[in-house]
Amino acid sequence: MPALGWAVAAILMLQTAMAEPSPGTLPRKAGVFSDLSNQELKAVHSFLWSKKELRLQPSSTTTMAKNTVFLIEMLLPKKYHVLRFLDKGERHPVREARAVIFFGDQEHPNVTEFAVGPLPGPCYMRALSPRPGYQSSWASRPISTAEYALLYHTLQEATKPLHQFFLNTTGFSFQDCHDRCLAFTDVAPRGVASGQRRSWLIIQRYVEGYFLHPTGLELLVDHGSTDAGHWAVEQVWYNGKFYGSPEELARKYADGEVDVVVLEDPLPGGKGHDSTEEPPLFSSHKPRGDFPSPIHVSGPRLVQPHGPRFRLEGNAVLYGGWSFAFRLRSSSGLQVLNVHFGGERIAYEVSVQEAVALYGGHTPAGMQTKYLDVGWGLGSVTHELAPGIDCPETATFLDTFHYYDADDPVHYPRALCLFEMPTGVPLRRHFNSNFKGGFNFYAGLKGQVLVLRTTSTVYNYDYIWDFIFYPNGVMEAKMHATGYVHATFYTPEGLRHGTRLHTHLIGNIHTHLVHYRVDLDVAGTKNSFQTLQMKLENITNPWSPRHRVVQPTLEQTQYSWERQAAFRFKRKLPKYLLFTSPQENPWGHKRTYRLQIHSMADQVLPPGWQEEQAITWARYPLAVTKYRESELCSSSIYHQNDPWHPPVVFEQFLHNNENIENEDLVAWVTVGFLHIPHSEDIPNTATPGNSVGFLLRPFNFFPEDPSLASRDTVIVWPRDNGPNYVQRWIPEDRDCSMPPPFSYNGTYRPV
């Protein structure tokens, strides 16, 4: 790395000089968490390019032997400084960017990160390290568009001997293919040891849903050199057998020694051919078949007669009792920050850390696949949301900018949406019967929630990320999985690792795991962790001493140390996970928020097993740690391609076994599910049953249900004469788009 002569003292002086006076409005204060604007991204880009000693080249240059800026995103200031700015009115923390540079044009290629600031007019940079003494290896870098282009060229050249083989067995080719081209899916980790960059590629026919069209051929390519001329195919797998090279496969094919599978033509009418005589591809989304009760009209949709009931200013949201900021981090995804309810902070940060999918299979690519999606730009693949499908048409859509494997900021329109919606179930209700065929009163509060949503399409899979805010102080984080399954070529042996989904297709067994960081600040930063469980007691009946009573009692456990509060998957996780404040509610209970996890996850890899080092967080459905600035993330963009020597090892967060009583606490939550693909996953996995997440629920935090402040409540009182009295606090709408006027009878009588 070229020598950089910026002094630390000069940086500190600049940080102090650029600090701003305390802002007075919420939107301006929320800006401390906001993603970099298009102008800020360009300013960082220009500043880095002005440093001639970096010898930067465009990302689009088709070579690995270059220095290029791969990623620019906002670098979150230290929590201590942010809280003093938010709560004490002190100076605005200096605004900085994180820049990741691939240094391939030097004797020892590496990846180096820098903090660049102050923004909006940067004038310094300093090196960053994921942990002291760690240097990200060249092989650990995420794959780039330029590398993909070189890989495709390598495949074209290496598979020339297989041209006739491809035409005869698939009808597609890498050579002069026009609308009948072959494509590939690369899997990771890329090798079997740190420092390797050897990828198995699944060769597929490039048609709609090509993920489901493997040809039976998989290739192992070594692409570790910065000189793509040295890249080579090391092994070949075809229909259950290994070959040493494409030439060997071509030779044995010509000699009739290969067990060939000739695939049916997926495009009998040609690409794009729209014929009513030909059924659509099984991987297509085109409708086919009929319901017993056909539906030929559009369904219900939301309306907002008076516009949105939330306020959105910049990256700040206000909704009923809620206020929070948000950002869409290019590397790892959606974060909500500075979350308040009723004017009190509940959480400083709730964020997605990583999403993994760990597979099994009979083919080499199937058994090698362990996807760690932050290594594929989990937060940057946030493509446009469709109104009326991905979000209600009433949603407010938000654009974002990402600088990820590009030469300029890339504009992603409608990457996020924010909307209020009815849940379809009351938040609460009660029918108070008079047990005489009538009622004393009916009271109900309609279920309404605010949803902040984005999606990540990581190649074949689509993740839908939601943060949901309820009017009673409950916050929910949820992930829905959909998209195409990761599939390999059918062999009879493959049925041990998945399900046959089509003639030549196996849907491979896999487990989805998602890791969240939940920095709870329950009425302050001094919190403790405890659990409540139900325990049965068997006692003498006090009013009938000859009999006994079995009844539940409360069993409370206080956790003093991090190791005590790290729950392994094989250990029973208590149902009530409580983060308490020293403060008490009016009834003498600690003001508390409960973490409630909804997950079907289990441990997938044995502890200490090779690649498991990159996902040691996956040992724990819950681990509670003391806040440390050195423990802000549980994964990184480097874990995918070097899981054997990752920069962040979550297990090390627990080694110091710090005290967690009356401390600033962080909950690390793992959720997920086992997915055994089935025929109904064609063409795409559906969202019902494939969602996981957790809730943060007030537990003695308030003196009563805070949703009593909602004016959506409706109470109905019976009258002896005339219509019942309906008590409302928001006038009933008479808009043409609204449902019929509300009415309620409440009687139940014999007929």
Swiss-Prot record:
Identify residues that carry 2',4',5'-topaquinone.
Answer: 461
What are the glycosylated positions?
110, 168, 538, 745
Q: Which GO terms describe its cellular component?
A: bicellular tight junction; extracellular exosome; extracellular region; extracellular space; peroxisome; plasma membrane; specific granule lumen
Q: What is its EC number?
A: 1.4.3.22
Q: Which cofactor does it need?
A: Cu(2+); Ca(2+); L-topaquinone
Q: Does the keyword ATP-binding apply?
A: no
- Name of the molecule in the record: Diamine oxidase [copper-containing]
Q: Which organism is it from?
A: Homo sapiens (Human)
